[in-house]
Amino acid sequence: MGIEMRCQDRRILLPSLLLLILMIGGVQATMKLCGRKLPETLSKLCVYGFNAMTKRTLDPVNFNQIDGFEDRSLLERLLSDSSVQMLKTRRLRDGVFDECCLKSCTMDEVLRYCAAKPRT
């Protein structure tokens, strides 16, 4: 009975560990940056300075679409065109303060406020 129990425990333990590893790998750390921490963090991370605190630079390729919002998705088919566009460009209205102080943000979101390398 002891050997059977160990085998059964292993059959449960291995898939559980694999699932845990996959879940941890997909988690991206978020942070809240308020007060002096926000401009200090931007200054340290952004080599060429950072953009205005009210909006980020527009990315002409994807027009700041929300990550994971695919064209012709079920949500898009259910909503009207204006609702879809509002969802896609929601972040255009929010500034770094809205994203990183009122809510928490990821490092990738902070870096999107960095100014581009100046053209020479």
Swiss-Prot record:
Keyword Secreted: yes
SS bond partners: C34-C101, C46-C114, C100-C105
Tissue: Expressed at a high level in seven cells of each larval brain hemisphere that may correspond to neurosecretory cells.
SUPFAM superfamilies in the cross-refs: Insulin-like
Main location: secreted
GO biological processes: female mating behavior; insulin receptor signaling pathway; locomotor rhythm; negative regulation of entry into reproductive diapause; response to carbohydrate; sleep
Entry GO CC: extracellular region; extracellular space
Localization per Swiss-Prot or TrEMBL: Secreted
Keyword check for Nucleotide-binding: no
Pfam family membership, one: Insulin
Residues making up the signal peptide according to the UniProt record: 1-29
Maturation propeptide residues: 51-89
Coiled coil, from the record: none
Molecular functions (GO terms): hormone activity; insulin receptor binding
Keywords: Cleavage on pair of basic residues, Disulfide bond, Secreted, Signal
Described function: Possible ligand of InR/insulin-like receptor.
Quaternary structure annotation from Swiss-Prot or TrEMBL: Heterodimer of a B chain and an A chain linked by two disulfide bonds.
Similarity comment: Belongs to the insulin family.
Protein name, entry field: Insulin-like peptide 3
Species of provenance: Drosophila melanogaster
Lineage, opening ranks: Eukaryota, Metazoa, Ecdysozoa, Arthropoda, Hexapoda
